[in-house]
């Protein structure tokens, strides 16, 4: 519950209050300070008694508000007056207002949890899983992740966004507190800062894994600089930071965090991976010692080290860290099936040029025969990935390629595939139906030296088509049918 008086105080203290508009009357203080709200929402279909409703988004329509009023809405917050006959709290920035009011409404749950946030172009989910398995050795961590979210350590569900909307985020935090959880691990996207989902939130530990061009397009970031800047905001809003010293533009980040408590990891730091093998590595520095690991690839070892250093700051012992790392597996990350002829099928979430390059390098290290890649690109987002995929594929000339659908949304998957193919300097196959593409690729293998690489969707059991999630069995399940 939150009173209107408290709402107004929060907004005024944040210089985010213009006035209340009630009909033709403008008010600085509301005439009835006893008004209270028992529910907050930004979804016009989610209206209960005493709801404070937030109008957000460029596509919001007046009729949504009118429907909410039919359901009993009596008050709303917005950046403009929709003139719908109920009182309005007019603000300058709706997203900032949502964050600050949600924090108070849910009794500041972030102060009752130790918070750990990961950002980076790739590896956020894997690093979050490492942290989850490390912290659960001695604590009760909750996790909000692209792949899975758990608020009680028992039940898991799929997240719609990498970083939830602020009203959902603070509600989740409050549920975690109510469930007796001690820590919260989450992924923070550049979009979360761009659109203000985590405004006013300071994390106990923030980790910056890496940076490469991604999420650049008309509805995301206009330039790489803008993308990089919004990624770096996590460092500004974290009490302790962990940074990969091998990442691009590290010199700038090193200067930025010089006056903050921090750790660096990687070749150019005290915390270096040595004696790296397929399923183990040694570490120098604060956590010097031997570590076994199930997830193959140097990038997974780097993610493990990042999570280890972060969890050390949050109370984990080195023994907890060693146990947690070896226990970690991630759905849709380097999952492997074996065909009857011995060929391997790799299913991985690699969905940009950088992660695809690392995936191909790991597979090529172990499989020396025919390699067939199945790949697509999402519609209406990250258009720059399409050219990036072409550049990566050109660097692997022996690779056979089948282009297919991967969340085409409102675009034609055939045209998306043709755009990717335009950047590839050799003939490729296009099979838009993803199931048929997987079946075809698996029919081309002959021996244990061969491999099929299914990239992009990981464990996602859906296809996004025309703005909606459409049922799809998932790459692993489809591949199992053709073993």
Swiss-Prot record:
ATP binds at residues 120-126. A motif (L-lysine recognition motif) lies at residues 406-409. One of its GO terms (molecular function) is magnesium ion binding. It catalyses: UDP-N-acetyl-alpha-D-muramoyl-L-alanyl-D-glutamate + L-lysine + ATP = UDP-N-acetyl-alpha-D-muramoyl-L-alanyl-gamma-D-glutamyl-L-lysine + ADP + phosphate + H(+). Belongs to the MurCDEF family. MurE subfamily. PANTHER family: MUR LIGASE FAMILY MEMBER, UDP-N-ACETYLMURAMOYL-L-ALANYL-D-GLUTAMATE--2,6-DIAMINOPIMELATE LIGASE MURE HOMOLOG, CHLOROPLASTIC. UDP-N-acetyl-alpha-D-muramoyl-L-alanyl-D-glutamate binds at residues 44, 162-163, 189, 197. Pathway: Cell wall biogenesis; peptidoglycan biosynthesis. It comes from the Bacteria. Its EC number is 6.3.2.7. InterPro entries: Mur-like_cat_sf, Mur_ligase_C, Mur_ligase_C_dom_sf, Mur_ligase_cen, MurE/MurF_N, UDP-N-AcMur-Glu-dNH2Pim_ligase. This is UDP-N-acetylmuramoyl-L-alanyl-D-glutamate--L-lysine ligase. GO terms for cellular component: cytoplasm. The gene is murE. SUPFAM superfamilies: MurD-like peptide ligases, catalytic domain (SSF53623), MurD-like peptide ligases, peptide-binding domain (SSF53244), MurE/MurF N-terminal domain (SSF63418). Carboxylation is probably crucial for Mg(2+) binding and, consequently, for the gamma-phosphate positioning of ATP. The keyword Nucleus does not apply.
């Amino acid at each position: 519950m939150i009173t209107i008086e408290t709402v107004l105080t929060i907004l005024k203290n944040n210089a985010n209050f213009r006035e209340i508009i009630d009909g033709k009357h403008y008010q600085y203080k509301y005439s009835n300070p006893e008004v209270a709200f028992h529910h907050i929402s930004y979804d016009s279909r989610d209206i209960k008694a005493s709801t404070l409703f937030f109008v957000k988004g460029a596509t919001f329509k007046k009729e949504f508000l009118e429907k909410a009023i039919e359901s009993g809405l009596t008050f709303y917050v917005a950046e403009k007056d929709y003139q719908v006959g109920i009182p309005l709290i007019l603000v300058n920035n709706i997203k900032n207002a949502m964050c600050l009011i949600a924090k108070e409404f849910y009794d500041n749950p972030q102060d009752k949890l130790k918070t750990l946030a990961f950002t980076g172009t790739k590896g956020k989910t894997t690093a979050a899983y490492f942290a989850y398995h490390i912290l659960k050795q001695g604590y009760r961590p909750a996790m909000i992740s692209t792949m899975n979210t758990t608020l009680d350590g028992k039940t898991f569900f799929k997240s719609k966004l990498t970083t939830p909307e602020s009203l959902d985020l603070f509600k989740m935090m409050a549920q975690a507190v109510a469930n007796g959880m001690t820590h919260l691990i989450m992924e923070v996207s550049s979009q979360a800062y761009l659109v203000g989902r985590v405004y006013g939130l300071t994390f106990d530990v923030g980790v910056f894994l890496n940076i490469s061009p991604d999420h650049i397009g008309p509805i995301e970031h206009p330039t790489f600089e803008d993308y990089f800047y919004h990624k770096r905001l996590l460092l500004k809003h974290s009490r302790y930071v962990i940074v990969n010293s091998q990442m691009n533009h590290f010199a700038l980040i090193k200067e930025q965090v010089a006056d903050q408590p921090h750790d660096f990891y990687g070749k150019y730091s005290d915390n270096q991976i040595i004696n790296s093998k397929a399923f183990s590595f040694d570490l120098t520095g604060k956590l010097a010692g031997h570590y076994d690991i199930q997830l193959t690839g140097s990038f997974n070892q780097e993610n493990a080290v990042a999570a280890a250093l972060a969890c050390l700051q949050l109370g984990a012992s080195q023994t907890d860290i060693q146990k947690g790392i070896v226990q970690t597996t991630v759905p849709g990350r380097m999952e492997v099936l074996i065909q009857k002829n011995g060929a391997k099928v790799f299913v991985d979430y690699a969905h940009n040029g950088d992660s695809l390059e690392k995936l191909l390098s790991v597979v090529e290290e172990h499989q020396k025969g025919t390699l067939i890649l199945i790949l697509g690109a999402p519609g209406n987002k990250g258009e720059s990935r399409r050219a990036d995929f072409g550049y990566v594929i050109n660097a692997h000339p022996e690779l056979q390629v089948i282009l297919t659908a991967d969340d085409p949304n409102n675009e034609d998957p055939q045209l998306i595939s043709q755009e990717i193919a335009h950047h590839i300097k050799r003939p490729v196959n296009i099979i838009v139906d993803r199931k048929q593409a997987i079946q075809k690729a698996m029919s081309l293998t002959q021996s244990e030296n061969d491999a099929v690489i299914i990239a992009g969707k990981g464990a996602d059991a859906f296809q996004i088509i025309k703005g909606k999630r459409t049922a799809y069995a998932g790459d692993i399940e489809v591949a199992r049918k053709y073993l």
